[in-house]
């Protein structure tokens, strides 16, 4: 009986991992997705639809490597949950797309958030983006603001970072 409960919990956890990253398929064309699927299937040694520590070990061993448990744990801990194909795409997508880690993005915005509230005045952020560093045009800022979480003139950079890294929430999750 406990094995059914455990299996049910595992399936629920796996389902959540997939839903949280479902927008990742828009990052790649069909040919790229097919290549990633082939690579995923090569790593998923036991063919259960998930890459687990043992799968990584077996795959690396087949390449003549002898990875330590710490090394494998480090690889597994890069994912916030079980590594199904969607999560696999997300992990590689972030590396291929060259986006910064979530905390780096939050900290960059946070440098200008003197009250540490997680928001910046919309007009102040526009001024910063158009006058400092790699300057944005007003059109660039307008485009960013079109989908940005702005309420009462405040840009929610914590939510913006979440959207940037994980995609917008599905309508049924809001």
From Swiss-Prot:
Disruption phenotype: Mitotic defects including failure in cytokinesis. The modification Phosphothreonine is found at residue 21. GO terms for molecular function: ATPase activator activity; calcium ion binding; myosin heavy chain binding. SMART domains: EFh. Ca(2+) binds at residues 44, 46, 48, 55. The keyword Lipid metabolism does not apply. It comes from the Eukaryota. The modification Phosphoserine is found at residue 22. One of its GO terms (cellular component) is apical plasma membrane. Phosphorylation plays a central role in myosin regulation. Residues 31-66, 100-135 form the EF-hand domain. GO terms for biological process: actin filament-based movement; apical constriction; apical constriction involved in gastrulation; border follicle cell migration; cell elongation involved in imaginal disc-derived wing morphogenesis; compartment boundary maintenance; formation of a compartment boundary; imaginal disc-derived wing hair organization. This chain binds calcium. Required for cytokinesis, could regulate contractile ring function. PANTHER family: MYOSIN REGULATORY LIGHT CHAIN 2. Myosin is a hexamer of 2 heavy chains and 4 light chains. This is Myosin regulatory light chain sqh. The gene is sqh.
């Amino acid at each position: 009986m406990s094995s059914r409960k455990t299996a049910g919990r595992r399936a629920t956890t796996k389902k959540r991992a997939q839903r949280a990253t479902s927008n990742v398929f828009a990052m790649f064309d069909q040919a790229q997705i097919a290549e990633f699927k082939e690579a995923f299937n090569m790593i998923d040694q036991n063919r259960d639809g998930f890459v687990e520590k043992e799968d990584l070990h077996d795959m690396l061993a087949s390449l003549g490597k002898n990875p330590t448990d710490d090394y494998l744990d480090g690889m597994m801990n890069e994912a916030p949950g079980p590594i199904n194909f969607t999560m696999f795409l997300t992990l590689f997508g972030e590396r291929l797309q060259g986006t910064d880690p979530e905390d780096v993005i939050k900290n960059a915005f946070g440098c200008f958030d003197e009250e540490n509230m997680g928001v910046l005045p919309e007009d102040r952020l526009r001024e910063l983006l158009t006058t400092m560093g790699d300057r944005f045009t007003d059109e660039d800022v307008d485009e960013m603001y079109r989908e940005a979480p702005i309420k009462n003139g405040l840009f929610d950079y914590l939510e913006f970072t979440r959207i940037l890294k994980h995609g917008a929430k599905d309508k049924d999750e809001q």
